[in-house]
Amino acid sequence: MAKQEYKQLPKRSEVHSATEQFKDTIKTSLGLDLFKGLGLTIKEFFSPSVTIHYPMEQLPLSPRYRAVHHLQRLLDSGSERCIGCGLCEKICTSNCIRIITHKGEDNRKKIDSYTINLGRCIYCGLCAEVCPELAIVMGNRFENASTQRSQYGSKSEFLTNEQDAKNCSHAEFLGFGAVSPNYNERMQATPLDYVQEPSKEESKEETPTRSESHKGDENV
């Protein structure tokens, strides 16, 4: 282990008399430290402001920002995307998602209740990642402060408006949990992707026809 060497700084002489205190004050006031602080203050005074008048003004958030959840609908039909599989409820680390379902006449799950306790949620985004239908996603509504300890969110608060989905007034979700736009370019090719199948023209050239094979037999 390397030996650490410490450099001891000279101790500052103690000031006792009033004359020495006055000299020390003048030296500190007219030294470089004062002008450095004033220079920084003047520089920041004339620099452009980085603050905004919240809540009248709000900064744009990233599309992958993790805030209050949002339940999606199909854009064309307006049907709910959630199939009631319960994966979001099982993977939730804070145990804040509660789903109650029943089996319908068509032997498919029907959702009776879907609640999220926003007071317990840590907004990790695991529910959005595990959802196979992209039904639950992370939105950008971060103003969810409440004076009540038991703060629950019902399904109607998170669900997209059916008429907006049918009219396609909103685009497909591109936030946290969605597939990246350039996912094809980022995917790594598997060994099977390098095996190229022969084209039809090459297979015709390599495989002789029946008439040519019969002519070869007659010549023999």
UniProtKB/Swiss-Prot annotation:
Keyword NAD: yes
Cofactor binding description: Binds 2 [4Fe-4S] clusters per subunit.
Disordered: annotated segments: 187-220
Protein keywords: 4Fe-4S, Cell inner membrane, Cell membrane, Iron, Iron-sulfur, Membrane, Metal-binding, NAD, Quinone, Repeat, Translocase, Ubiquinone
One Gene Ontology CC term in the entry: plasma membrane
Sections of the chain in a coiled coil: none
Membrane topology reported for the UniProt record: Peripheral membrane protein
InterPro entries (alphabetical): 4Fe4S_Fe-S-bd, 4Fe4S_Fe_S_CS, NADH_quinone_OxRdtase_chainI
Domain of life of the native organism: Bacteria
Reaction(s) the record says it catalyses: a quinone + NADH + 5 H(+)(in) = a quinol + NAD(+) + 4 H(+)(out)
Compositionally biased tracts (Basic and acidic residues): 198-220
Cofactors: [4Fe-4S] cluster
Quaternary organization: NDH-1 is composed of 14 different subunits. Subunits NuoA, H, J, K, L, M, N constitute the membrane sector of the complex.
Family according to the record: Belongs to the complex I 23 kDa subunit family.
Listed PANTHER family: NADH DEHYDROGENASE [UBIQUINONE] IRON-SULFUR PROTEIN 8, MITOCHONDRIAL, NADH DEHYDROGENASE UBIQUINONE IRON-SULFUR PROTEIN 8, MITOCHONDRIAL
Function: NDH-1 shuttles electrons from NADH, via FMN and iron-sulfur (Fe-S) centers, to quinones in the respiratory chain. The immediate electron acceptor for the enzyme in this species is believed to be ubiquinone. Couples the redox reaction to proton translocation (for every two electrons transferred, four hydrogen ions are translocated across the cytoplasmic membrane), and thus conserves the redox energy in a proton gradient.
Record protein name field: NADH-quinone oxidoreductase subunit I
Organism: Helicobacter pylori (strain G27)
